[in-house]
Amino acid sequence: MTDKTSLSYKDAGVDIDAGNALVDRIKGVVKQTRRPEVMGGLGGFGALCALPQKYREPILVSGTDGVGTKLRLAMDLKRHDTIGIDLVAMCVNDLVVQGAEPLFFLDYYATGKLDVDTAASVITGIAEGCKQSGCALVGGETAEMPGMYHGEDYDVAGFCVGVVEKSEIIDGSKVQNGDVLVALASSGPHSNGYSLVRKVLEVSKTDPEQFELEGKPLADHLLAPTKIYVKSILSLIEKVDVHAISHLTGGGFWENIPRVLPEGMQATIDESSWQWPAVFNWLQQAGNVSRHEMYRTFNCGVGMIIALPAEQADEAVALLNSSGENAWKIGVITQTDAGDAVVIN
């Protein structure tokens, strides 16, 4: 009988010990996100969460998202600490536009070879995003898959569930002629348009760590974490009658605003009401990107747009600014029989 080498999972490229070490590293930060409705801790086959008792007719709202090729830029620049905030933001911001309070979040982290330090940095960012949005990080999956990803490259996805009172769902059906649009400033490109960002960097031969914009590296502008608007919006909808909220993500102004407009309504955006942050001016100039394409690809400094009655617009702006946002009136809703759903002038 010939002797054969005894193979292990580690020989195949999967390090179970590294996975266990990661769990030990992240337990503390995950615990900080806990909500009273969560039952049990990490390690179960499934996470249990009760519905908050304040809801009479609770409706669950769910969403899933990633961070696109912003992740490639983060990996290239070896900056992993805020990409987790981006991941949470992309999910919870999509929930809150419907009036939903985020309850719990799960993440999926996949890599060719698990680097515990990198993964811990990413998941610490996820926990920070959960704290900012008031939702619990109840579980996740870390998949080490040799041969599926190059080296220590990784991908992340997020999954979030929230709850809203049935009678208070925000779906755009109340939008009407004369409504005012209020904008909330973004922190940068957020997590959209990064394939174009990377192409502009390539074509312009720009090193984002060396090139400075407004006194700091371009990389700082490009990797600024996506703003999480949950707490300020949940506070706002308790005080004013919000008709619709649009989260400006992929598709920019042209595609996201119409998603919350009833048929026959047109949003007119006043371009003079704000100035593009420097990073967007740089992207447009360095990439010779058309104005239409900028508004189609990027948020251009606007992360959210809220439609509400004209008589409540000033109050809404004041409330949002007092909660730490940079808010302003950006446009109006009018009735139209024809033409584009969004006009920017």
From Swiss-Prot:
Keywords: ATP-binding, Cytoplasm, Ligase, Nucleotide-binding, Purine biosynthesis. It holds the Pfam family AIRS_C. One of its GO terms (molecular function) is phosphoribosylamine-glycine ligase activity. Its EC number is 6.3.3.1. Disulfide bonds: none annotated. The keyword Lipid metabolism does not apply. GO terms for cellular component: cytosol. InterPro entries: PurM-like_C_dom, PurM-like_C_sf, PurM-like_N, PurM-like_N_sf, PurM_cligase. It catalyses: 2-formamido-N(1)-(5-O-phospho-beta-D-ribosyl)acetamidine + ATP = 5-amino-1-(5-phospho-beta-D-ribosyl)imidazole + ADP + phosphate + H(+). It is an enzyme of class 6 (ligase). Pathway: Purine metabolism; IMP biosynthesis via de novo pathway; 5-amino-1-(5-phospho-D-ribosyl)imidazole from N(2)-formyl-N(1)-(5-phospho-D-ribosyl)glycinamide: step 2/2. NCBIfam families: purM. Belongs to the AIR synthase family. HAMAP family: AIRS. This is Phosphoribosylformylglycinamidine cyclo-ligase. The gene is purM.
